[in-house]
């Protein structure tokens, strides 16, 4: 279904059985069982290879326990490395005092055959870890790319859930950084592990989250057609991208552009200037079309109307703060524009920023306050309407779907729109040319304009996007032919998309929705998108990443009594993220 050999998330019984395999031997227990008696040289084994060895072991146990092959491409590639004669020779020479080459080869063959190792076979994974450490770096990166491929489908994919167990994911990073809560470092006895993580992974039961799941596909199409103007995104989505430099950080992304699935293995290639769009559907703003604030947006379609809509909720979607004031962490958008948003100011003094963030918050606010959001207002109507109400004539763009009048030529920021030549001219609607549009509700652009709102670097979503950008950047850096000459402008960028919908009126009930040439069966109609660019400070990213990696490695070392080494490539990220000095 998603191009992976994994089980459907909807099969609760099967997924529960697979998670039970992980619960039976969590990462910490695997490390103690495997390496406590082989600590000589363990300090030199990076966590990246330990993570790969553990993933292979869990998938092999799944096959033996349930007879279901999981992550077969990954398993096949690791088995091929285990049988690599060159790597076996090097391993035998380096560890001749511990075992003969024949003994090492026999152990690695048992691993490749996925044999039952309950009878003293844990040493096999010592040799597998050492062998993976000898493999070229690009081979290790390819294995992490295969894990991403095997986890596509995200919450519907069992591999995605399993990999998240031992990952500080983008959604967990904020708590790991601010409060030191480390969900990936499971207890050594396995308690409190699988159940709690599994519940968190399946938290899509609230109305707001269900609303986002149902409408995410439509929002992706709107971004593709009206923000990126037809640029091809990653089709069928991405799985869990695990940072190949640490093996610990991970990110699951909603929508990516400039990332290709290449070769027969369909692994990822990150191109220069890739873009990530993090989508947030604002369930709390779902209103009827006759709501006065919705009508105000559709009639006036300007920043003041949108600001009024955002302020109509008891907890406004944009928080106003003065230039020198500290924001709260309640909402993910901020504004310094008193004329539009001063009414959102609360007299209660906000809490102080958490200690790890306090030193950097002013700089992060300074970097982001110069950015401006772009608002795109939408409406939908039947194409056989006579437009007698004075609405703009609807035209159809040959590649992008629908537009209203010349709204597509409005005053949008160039960095969000692309060059003027990206889109072909609109084609007038004719019944005989487009019969498939009749009887459907067709989404079209009403207007677009700027909104003085920027991202709140104190909110947890900022940290979620920070890790998305960091992990994707590491894949770009690792695959770059000349990393020392990377242009910082070629690294991935991130945008936050806030999507607001309205309810259908009576005449719209039961009609299919058409957007970007695709049919959707959504219960609601898109009202507007707010697209906000996000700016990161490489120095702060290094600080945040280093803090979490250090905490996690110390915590797991304490629980396992092993010297866990989690590599940290944040310095290399900083070098690639800042302009190079001008040559004299």
From Swiss-Prot:
Q: Is the keyword Hydrolase in the record?
A: yes
Question: Keyword annotations for this protein?
Answer: Endonuclease, Exonuclease, Host cytoplasm, Host nucleus, Host-virus interaction, Hydrolase, Nuclease
Cellular component GO terms held in the UniProt record: host cell cytoplasm; host cell nucleus
Subcellular location(s) of the protein: Host nucleus; Host cytoplasm
**GO molecular function list:** DNA binding; DNA endonuclease activity; DNA exonuclease activity
Keyword Hydrolase assigned to the entry: answer is yes
Which parts of the sequence are marked as the site Required for function? 216, 254, 278, 280
**Quaternary structure?**
Interacts with major DNA-binding protein; this interaction increases the nuclease processivity of the alkaline exonuclease.
Question: According to its UniProt entry, what is the function of this protein?
Answer: Plays a role in processing non linear or branched viral DNA intermediates in order to promote the production of mature packaged unit-length linear progeny viral DNA molecules. Exhibits endonuclease and exonuclease activities and accepts both double-stranded and single-stranded DNA as substrate. Exonuclease digestion of DNA is in the 5'-> 3' direction and the products are 5'-monophosphate nucleosides. Additionally, forms a recombinase with the major DNA-binding protein, which displays strand exchange activity.
Q: What is this protein called?
A: Alkaline nuclease
Q: Which organism is it from?
A: Human cytomegalovirus (strain Merlin)
């Amino acid at each position: 279904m998603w191009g992976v050999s994994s089980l459907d998330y909807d099969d609760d019984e099967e997924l529960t059985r697979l998670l039970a395999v992980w619960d039976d031997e969590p990462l910490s227990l695997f490390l103690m069982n495997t390496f406590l008696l082989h600590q000589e040289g363990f300090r030199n084994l990076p966590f990246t290879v330990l993570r790969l060895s553990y993933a292979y072991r869990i998938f092999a146990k799944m096959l033996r326990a349930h007879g279901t092959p999981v992550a077969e491409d990954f398993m096949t590639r690791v088995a091929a490395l285990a049988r690599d004669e060159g790597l076996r020779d090097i391993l035998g020479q380096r560890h001749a005092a511990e075992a003969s080459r024949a003994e090492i080869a026999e152990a690695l063959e048992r691993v490749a055959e996925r044999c039952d190792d309950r009878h003293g076979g844990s040493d096999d994974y010592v040799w597998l870890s050492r062998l993976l450490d000898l493999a070229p770096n690009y081979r290790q990166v390819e294995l992490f790319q295969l894990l991403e491929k095997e986890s596509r489908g995200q919450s519907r994919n069992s591999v995605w859930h399993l990999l998240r167990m031992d990952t500080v994911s983008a959604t967990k990073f904020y708590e790991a950084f601010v409060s030191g809560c480390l969900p990936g470092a499971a207890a050594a006895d396995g308690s409190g592990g699988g159940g709690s993580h599994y519940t968190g992974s399946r938290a899509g039961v609230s109305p707001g989250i269900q609303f986002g799941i149902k409408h995410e596909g439509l929002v992706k199409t709107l971004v593709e057609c009206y923000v990126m103007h037809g640029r091809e995104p990653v089709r069928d989505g991405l799985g869990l991208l695990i940072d190949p430099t640490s093996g610990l950080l991970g990110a699951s992304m909603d929508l990516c552009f400039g990332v290709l699935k290449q070769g027969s293995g369909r692994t990822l290639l990150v191109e220069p200037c890739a873009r990530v769009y993090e989508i947030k559907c604002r369930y709390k703003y779902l209103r009827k079309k006759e709501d006065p604030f919705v009508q105000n947006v559709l009639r006036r379609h300007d920043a003041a109307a949108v600001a009024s809509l955002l302020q109509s909720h008891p907890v406004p979607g944009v928080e106003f703060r003065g230039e020198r004031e500290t924001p709260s962490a309640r909402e993910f958008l901020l504004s310094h524009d008193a004329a539009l948003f001063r009414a959102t100011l609360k007299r209660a003094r906000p809490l102080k920023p958490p200690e790890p963030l306090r030193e950097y918050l002013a700089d992060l606010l300074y970097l982001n306050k110069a950015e401006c959001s772009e608002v795109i207002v939408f409406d939908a109507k039947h194409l056989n309407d006579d437009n007698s109400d004075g609405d703009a004539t609807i035209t159809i763009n040959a590649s992008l779907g629908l537009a209203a009048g010349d709204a597509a030529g409005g005053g949008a920021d160039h960095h969000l729109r692309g060059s003027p030549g990206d889109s072909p001219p609109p084609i007038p609607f004719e019944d005989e040319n487009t019969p498939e549009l009749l009887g459907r509700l067709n989404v079209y652009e009403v207007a677009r304009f700027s909104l003085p709102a920027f991202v709140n670097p104190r909110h947890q979503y900022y940290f979620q996007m920070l890790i998305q950008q960091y992990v994707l950047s590491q894949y770009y850096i690792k695959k770059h032919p000349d990393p020392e000459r990377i242009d910082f402008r070629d690294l991935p960028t991130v945008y936050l998309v806030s999507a607001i919908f309205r309810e259908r009126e009576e005449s719209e009930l039961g009609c299919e929705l058409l957007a970007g040439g695709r049919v959707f069966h959504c219960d609601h109609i898109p009202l507007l998108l707010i697209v906000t660019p996000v700016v990161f400070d490489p120095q702060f990213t290094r600080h945040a990443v280093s803090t979490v990696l250090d905490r996690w490695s110390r915590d797991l070392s304490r629980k396992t009594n092993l010297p866990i080494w989690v590599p940290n490539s944040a310095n290399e990220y900083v070098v690639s993220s800042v302009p190079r000095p001008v040559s004299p």
